[in-house]
C-alpha cells in the first residue's frame, strides 16, 4: 500500500487530470510519450492509450514517483495550454517550484517549454544555461496544433538563403531615388551571400566584426525560426562558440504585454532556468554576450515614440520600451552584440536607432531547400516524393513555396489530404488562395464530426484582426475579444480549428498563429466593409513593400477574384460588394495620372497585387493607364512569374522593362563562361533557368500587344528554351516590337538559331541587345545567317562581352557586306585581337556597308589594328563614330590611325581613345588631323599621359581655323597649371569648342583662375567646363560662382 502522502498525491493528481477534456487528455498522453524527462522510464503507449484520469495518475506515480510525476504533469499542462492547472498546481505541497514572476520572453507558439527543477544538481553556470536553452528550443509546436505534433527543431529546420548588403539600404534609396532606383528592393544589386555562422565575422568591408546584425525578411520568411535555431545551435556547441559565452532570446511580441519596469538583470533573469542567479560574472565580459531581439516590427508603436532619459546602468529599472531602446541605441551595455529580426516595414525606424549595422536579408528557400523542407516535413519518404512530384508538375505553387510559411501551409494541407485517403487535388495559384485553401481545409469535417465547421461570429473575428492591424497590435485580451462580440468559448472553438492560439505564459492573451493570418483576416474585413475600409487601406499602403499593410493589401486584391468571392459566399456566407473592385480600379487610375502614365515606383508591388486577382479583364483595365512599365530588381522566380503573367495584359504599354537582381536566379554576377565548358557554375545556371511558362507569357505579350515597341529583359535567365518560346511571339505577324534587349539572360549559342529566324520574320525589329551572354563564335555564325538575310531590317545590334574571338570577324564582315540596314555595331569586351579586326575591316570597306557607329572598346587591339582601321576610314564614308577605348594602341598605333583620319574621304565625327596608353607623341598626329579634318566634332583622350607638352602640341590643331571640334575630354591626362595657358589660348580662338572636360588634373588655383579670366570674355563660346577632382581654395570657388552669375548658361562642375 502506498504511504498516505503518496496516496494524497495520487488522488490530487487524478483530480487535475479529470478536469481535462477528452482531446486534452489525449494530447497530454502524447506529450508525455515524447518527454525526454522520462529517459528510460517512459510509460508504454499501449498502457496509456485507453487509460482514464485515475489510471493515468497511477501509471505516472508507479513509473517515476509522486513528486516527479507532479513536476512532469505541470510541465505538460503548460504544453497543452492549461495554464490554470499549471498555476494551481504550484501551490500543491508536493511541488515546491517558485514561479518566475519576471518577464516572459520566450514566444509561446514556437517553443515547447520545459521547467528546470530548482533541486537539480548544481552545474557550471554556462553548462546549466545551455542545458536549459537546449531543452527549451529543441522542440517546437507545429502551428497546425494537431494532437501531439511537437517536432524537433533541428529535424524540421531547413537552411535559408541569406544575403548581406554592402550599404545602408535607406541611404542607398535616398541617394538614387531620382536616378533609377525607385524601390528599396533595388539595393540587392549590391548583395552577396552570407551564412548564419559568419553573421558576426569581419569581411572585406568590415575589418572589425559587426556588433549589430539586422536580419530582415518579409512575412513568413522564417525569421523567428532562424532565431530559435541560433539559440539551439549555440547551446549545442555548433555556433558562435569562440564568439559568445551567452546568448539571450528576447521576444518583442511578449514584451508588448509587459507594463512593469525592469532592468537588464531582470531581462536576463527571465531567460534563466532558475531565479536568484548572480549576473555579476556575466557583466564582466559584456562583449561576449549576444542578445537576439526577435520581431522588432511587432513592438507597439509607443516604443518608437519613447523619449529619454535613457537607461545607462544594467541594474537600473525602466519601462521596457526605454530599456530596449537604450540597448538598441547602444547607450546601455554598448559592448554587447545584437541580432535583430524585423519585417521591412520597420526598417526605417530601426535604422534611425543604429549606427553601421550589418544588414542581412532572408530571401527564403532555394529550389533545393524547398525539396529538402518537404522531405523534412513528411517523415514518410514516399509521401514526400509524391507531394514533391505533384508540386513540380504545378510550378507556380512550387515557386511560391520559396516562402517558408507558404511551404508549411501547403505541406499541412496536402498532408491532410493524404491522411484522409484523398487524391491530391488541384492546388491554388496565389498566396491568397493558399491561405484560403488552408482555412477551409481546417474547417473540413474531421473523423467523428459530421458537418463542415464554420467558426462562430465570423464578423467579430475579422474586425478583431483589422483593428489589431490598424493599431499594430498582435496580442489580444478578453476585453478586446468582448469588444468584437467574441468570448472565450468562441476563441476556444477556433483554437480547435487552429486559427487562434492561446499564449502559454499568459492565460488572458490570444493571438493568431502567425501575423500573416491576422493580415489575411484583416483583408477580409476590408473586402466585406466596402469602399471606406478599402480606401483607407490603399491610402496608407501606397504600394510600398516597407509598409505594414503590404501583405494585407495583397490579400485584399486576391479576395476580389470572382471564384474566391463565390467560394466565400458559398462556404462562409460572406458577400463582397462589387464597389470594392471599382474603388481599387479608381485608385490605380489616380496613381497612373499622378505619375504620368509611367509605372515604376512600386511597380512590382502593384503587379504582385494584380497577380492575386487572376482575372484578365480586371488586370487589363488596371494596367490600361500605363504606357511605360519598369520593374527593377526582380529577385525570385515567383516575382518573375508575376511580372510575365501581368505583361500579357499590358495592352496599352509601349515600353516594358523587367530587370532581375543579382540573385534573381540564385547565381552570382559572374562573367559568362566559354561555350562548351561544362563547369559547376554552368550546371547551376541551367538548374536556375526560369520556367518555360515565363517566356510563354512574354511571347504572348509581344504578339497580342500591338502597342509594345520596346521590351528589355535584364538578368532574366531565359536559357535556350526560353528564347525559343519568346521567338515564337516575335515571329508572329501581329508583333510590332522594334527594340529587344536580352542582356545577361543566360543565352547560349544554340539559341541564336531561333533569334536568327525571328529577325528574318519580324521586319519591325530594328534594335537587338544580346550583351553579356555566352554566344561564342558558333552562336554568332547562326545569328549572322539571319542578320544577312534580305528580309532582315535590324539597324543596331549590341554584342558586348559575348565571348567573340578573332573568327567572329569573318561572320560579321559577311553581315556588313550584305546588310545595308545595319548602322550600329557594339563589340565591346570581346577579344577580337588584331586578326579579328582585320577580318571585320573587310566588311567595313565593302560598298554595301552603311555602318555609322562602331564600338571596339576592350577588344585586345594593338598597333596592327590601327593600320587596318586607317585604310578603312579612307574608304568608308558612312562611319561617323568609333570607340577604341581601353586598347593598347600606343603612340605609334594612333599615328597610323591619323593617316586615315586625315584623308579627305574620312567622315568620322566622334573618336574615343580613352585609356589607350598615349603620350605626347600621339598629340602630334592628332593635331595634324584637326588641321585638315572638318568633320571631327568629339574627341576623347581621357586617362592618357599626355602631360602639358601633349596639350601644347594638341593646341596647334585646336587653334587652327579648320578645326571644328565641339567636345573634348582630357580627364586625368596629367595636366598642371602650365597647361592652362594653352587652354586659355585655345578658348580665346576656337569658336566651335563648347564642352571641355578636365576632371582629375592638377590645374591648381592659378590655372583655374586663368581659365576663369578667359571664360569671362564675351567671345568665349564654351558652355560646359568640368573641373571635378581638384583641390581648389575658397577664393577660386568664389570666382567660379561669380562667373556663373555672369554667364548663367555656363555649366561649371567642380
UniProtKB/Swiss-Prot annotation:
Tissue specificity statement from the Swiss-Prot or TrEMBL entry: Mainly expressed in dendritic cells (DCs) and neutrophils.
Keywords annotated in UniProt: ATP-binding, Cytoplasm, Leucine-rich repeat, Nucleotide-binding, Repeat
Species assigned in the record: Mus musculus (Mouse)
Residues annotated to bind ATP: 217-224
Subunit record text: Interacts (via pyrin domain) with ASC. Interacts (via pyrin domain) with FAF1 (via UBA domain). Interacts with MAP3K14; this interaction promotes proteasomal degradation of MAP3K14. Interacts with NOD2; this interaction promotes degradation of NOD2 through the ubiquitin-proteasome pathway. Interacts with HSPA1A and HSPA8. Interacts with HSP90AA1. Interacts with TRIM25; this interaction inhibits RIGI-mediated signaling pathway.
Name under which the protein is recorded: NACHT, LRR and PYD domains-containing protein 12
Chain ranges of the Pyrin domain: 1-95
LRR repeat positions: 821-841, 850-871, 878-899, 907-928, 935-955, 964-985, 992-1013, 1021-1042
Homology family: Belongs to the NLRP family.
Null allele phenotype: NLRP12-deficient mice exhibit attenuated inflammatory responses due to significantly reduced capacity of dendritic cells to migrate to draining lymph nodes. They also gained significantly more weight and a greater percentage of body fat than wild-type mice. NLRP12-deficient mice also exhibit enhanced disease in a mouse model of multiple sclerosis. During viral infection, augments host response with greater type I interferon production and RIGI protein.
Lineage, top ranks: Eukaryota, Metazoa, Chordata, Craniata, Vertebrata
